[in-house]
A protein has these predicted regions:
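RNA pseudouridine synthases
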Residues: 1-204
């Protein structure tokens, strides 16, 4: 998996940056501590690694790991103070009429195995995601950039669902337009549904 050097994007004495494949956890999820993860696969080759941020199991893309405590602390501070811009690209089922829009609906992360995250105006925590359309396709699909300014589990998927869209290959989240977003963004559904064998969400 990481034997392919093309998945090692950057390495020095302080950092390791890799392209994490879809279907691989960043670290154990608490339900199965022995399961294979990005860190467990990388540490035999690169030594002890500190997790700076996580990518959901289904999400592929750029994963940054620290190679010492000081670097880990410094990078954590940068992420916490929003000095690091996070951007994801996704393939959505449907075409929004707006080129960009914001979702600022509070999220409640459930603690079950699926980690299903829902919109909850009472118990949810403040969350914000900016969406912008990269391209629209005649098949009724669109390529969208998502920039989450908070970092909750499945935040992009939950906020996209509230926008009336879902990600190709997502078995968990289906479109459920929230009234506040439905007034801003109108969705043209896809002409035909395609089958994706993975979640089409990539950390850019």
């Amino acid at each position: 998996m990481f034997d392919d050097e093309s998945n090692i994007l950057y390495i020095d004495d302080f950092l390791l940056v890799v392209n994490k494949p879809s279907g691989l956890l960043t670290i154990p999820d608490g339900y199965n501590p022995e399961i294979e993860t990005a860190r467990s696969l990388l540490e035999p080759e690169y030594g002890h690694l500190w997790i700076v941020h996580r990518l959901d199991k289904g999400t592929s893309g750029i994963l940054v790991l620290a190679r010492d405590k000081d670097t880990h602390r410094a990078l954590n501070q940068q992420f916490a103070s929003h000095e690091v811009r996070k951007e994801y690209h996704l393939v959505a089922l449907g075409i929004p009429d707006q080129n960009q829009w914001d979702v600022a609906l509070p999220l409640l992360v459930n603690g079950n195995r699926s980690h299903h995250t829902t919109i909850d105006l009472q118990a949810g925590k403040t969350a914000f995601t900016h969406f912008s359309v990269i391209d629209r396709f005649t098949s009724g699909y669109s390529c969208i950039s998502a920039q989450p300014y908070t970092g909750y589990t499945h935040q992009i998927r939950a906020h996209l669902t509230a926008s009336g869209l879902s990600i190709a290959g997502d078995p968990l989240y289906k479109p459920k337009p929230h009234p506040s977003i439905e007034q801003q963004v109108k969705i043209t559904p896809p002409k035909n549904l395609i089958t994706a064998n993975r979640l089409m969400l990539h950390a850019w």
